[in-house]
């Protein structure tokens, strides 16, 4: 999948799940399941419920995403 195909949207982490998975409520009100990207995992960036994050969504499955940035 090319990098141009992803949809980037902001959201808020609502719940923490096992295996570095999170429930994220997007700006449009949808709740998706998201995992942590490799760069965030590599740099030991902690993500907690209530954090604002940027999520990448695939156009093929809009219910799952990847957290690529945590706002300060």
UniProtKB/Swiss-Prot annotation:
GO molecular function, one term: ribosome binding
PROSITE patterns, per database record: S1_IF1_TYPE
CDD domains: S1_IF1
Cellular component terms per the entry's GO annotation: cytosol
Gene3D superfamilies: Nucleic acid-binding proteins
Segments forming domain S1-like: 1-72
Keyword annotations from UniProtKB, A to Z: Cytoplasm, Initiation factor, Protein biosynthesis, RNA-binding, rRNA-binding
Major localisation: cytoplasm
Subcellular location: Cytoplasm
Purpose: One of the essential components for the initiation of protein synthesis. Stabilizes the binding of IF-2 and IF-3 on the 30S subunit to which N-formylmethionyl-tRNA(fMet) subsequently binds. Helps modulate mRNA selection, yielding the 30S pre-initiation complex (PIC). Upon addition of the 50S ribosomal subunit IF-1, IF-2 and IF-3 are released leaving the mature 70S translation initiation complex.
Quaternary assembly: Component of the 30S ribosomal translation pre-initiation complex which assembles on the 30S ribosome in the order IF-2 and IF-3, IF-1 and N-formylmethionyl-tRNA(fMet); mRNA recruitment can occur at any time during PIC assembly.
Protein family according to the UniProt entry: Belongs to the IF-1 family.
Name of the protein in question: Translation initiation factor IF-1
């Amino acid at each position: 999948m090319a990098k141009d195909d992803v949809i980037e949207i902001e959201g808020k982490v609502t719940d923490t799940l096992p295996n570095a998975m999170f429930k994220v409520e997007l700006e449009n009100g949808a709740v998706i399941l998201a995992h942590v990207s490799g760069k965030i995992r590599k740099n030991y960036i902690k993500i907690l419920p209530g954090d604002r994050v940027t999520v990448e969504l695939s156009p093929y499955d809009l219910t799952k995403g990847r957290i690529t940035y945590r706002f300060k």
